[in-house]
């Protein structure tokens, strides 16, 4: 197979420094070429930007792809529409709005708008759909970002997003493994906990992940979320310890790889979050995240420092060569599955400016208006004020 040959040939000819660099997907804070060159100097595997003006983002991604040896993964938080990629993209609606409209077609349209508009900029990886479950309404992360509290509905709607993403040749990242929405605390501030039993998890989150993996989801985002039931099941010595999934071999290898059969790429959630940083010294946790089952590190406090931590971790044995090669192979395989190696040769990694006409199309705007209408939900009407009729004056 030509694609496999590209992966293996590329890997065989990579230096240690290049393999270390591929493990990182930093966030960009400037579109200045000098700044971009600094990031690219570390042989990064991916590059993330928050939403910006479409023309500027497209130009930035073009520059980055033209100045890197191995094509970049360009991810974006495409959770609610094209506005996740560009400020002048279509703001479609949150996942909860799709669920409230009560038809999976709205989730398909979300995926179609988000991924087609993202693709127009050169984005090739959606950090979506969110497949968390709103089990606890106090949770500060999930709420309107999810498809609700019914696992079957969450799966059905996430599957439609995945279908649309596939049509746009966009990789998805189902998140946040092993599942947010149980705890009411925020991983930005600490390591939160999914406290479900193994049986409860299997029937809910586990069922969602299993089916989406079987449907072809290419990547999984590991949250800074512990799940004691499964962690202690696979390793009784962890009893009483809170270890985030992003650092847990038990959850990433024993559960995700071995039990659920996932063979794609695993990326951490943002590692400057306290849910990750509180787990130990960064000089240890950065290489340990890869050693314990993640394939890429999302964001950095300092890319140069993290790069050195990873390199030192490899040299002192925290990161094995076997795991380094495996992670790089998965990164390259994802790129090959998206035809990035072929697009680089043809200089087609980022579309031309004419592709920007796909943003805020008449159809996309109409879809957004329809979702806004259909997602309005009556929660309660104790005073029986609805429907509002022109003949009735509430104040009387």
How does the language model describe each region?
Residues 38-50, 112-125:
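Catalytic domains of carbohydrate-active enzymes, especially glycoside hydrolases
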Residues 57-67, 82-84, 149-323:
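Second-shell residues forming the walls of enzyme active-site clefts
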Residues 1-93, 381:
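N-terminal hydrophobic targeting/anchoring segments and the immediately downstream early-domain regions
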């Amino acid at each position: 197979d030509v694609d496999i040959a590209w992966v293996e040939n590329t890997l065989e000819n990579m230096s240690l420094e290049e393999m270390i660099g591929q493990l990182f997907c930093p966030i960009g804070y400037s579109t200045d070429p000098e700044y971009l060159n600094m990031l690219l100097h570390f042989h990064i595997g991916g590059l993330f930007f928050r939403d910006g003006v479409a023309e500027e983002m497209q130009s930035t991604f073009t520059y980055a792809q033209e100045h890197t040896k191995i094509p970049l993964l360009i991810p974006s938080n495409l959770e609610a529409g094209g506005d996740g990629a560009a400020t002048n993209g279509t703001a479609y609606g949150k996942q909860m709005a799709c669920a409230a409209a009560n038809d999976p077609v709205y989730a398909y349209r979300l995926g179609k708008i988000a991924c087609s508009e993202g693709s127009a900029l050169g984005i090739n990886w959606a950090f979506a759909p969110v497949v968390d479950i709103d089990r606890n309404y106090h949770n500060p992360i999930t709420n309107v970002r999810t498809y609700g509290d019914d696992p079957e509905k969450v799966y059905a709607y996430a599957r439609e997003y995945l279908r649309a993403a596939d049509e746009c040749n966009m990789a998805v990242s189902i998140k946040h493994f092993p599942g947010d929405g149980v705890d009411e605390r925020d991983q930005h501030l600490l390591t939160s906990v999914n406290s479900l039993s193994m049986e409860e998890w299997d029937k809910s989150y586990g069922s969602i992940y299993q089916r989406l993996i079987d449907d072809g989801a290419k990547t999984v985002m590991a949250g800074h979320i512990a799940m004691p039931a499964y962690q202690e099941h696979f390793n009784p010595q962890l009893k009483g310890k809170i270890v985030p999934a992003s650092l847990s071999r038990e959850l990433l290898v024993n559960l995700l790889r071995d039990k659920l059969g996932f063979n794609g790429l695993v990326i951490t959630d943002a590692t400057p979050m306290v849910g990750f940083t509180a787990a130990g010294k960064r000089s240890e946790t950065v290489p340990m995240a890869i050693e314990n089952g993640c394939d890429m590190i999302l964001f950095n406090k300092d890319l140069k420092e993290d790069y050195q931590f990873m390199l030192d971790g490899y040299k002192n044995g925290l990161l094995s060569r076997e795991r380094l090669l495996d992670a790089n192979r998965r990164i390259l395989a994802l790129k090959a599955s998206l035809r990035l190696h072929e697009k680089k040769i043809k200089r087609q990694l980022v579309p031309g400016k004419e592709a920007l006409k796909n943003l805020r199309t008449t159809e996309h705007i109409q879809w957004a208006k329809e979702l806004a209408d259909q997602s309005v939900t009556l929660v309660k009407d104790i005073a029986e004020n609805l429907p509002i009729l022109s003949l009735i004056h509430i104040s009387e």
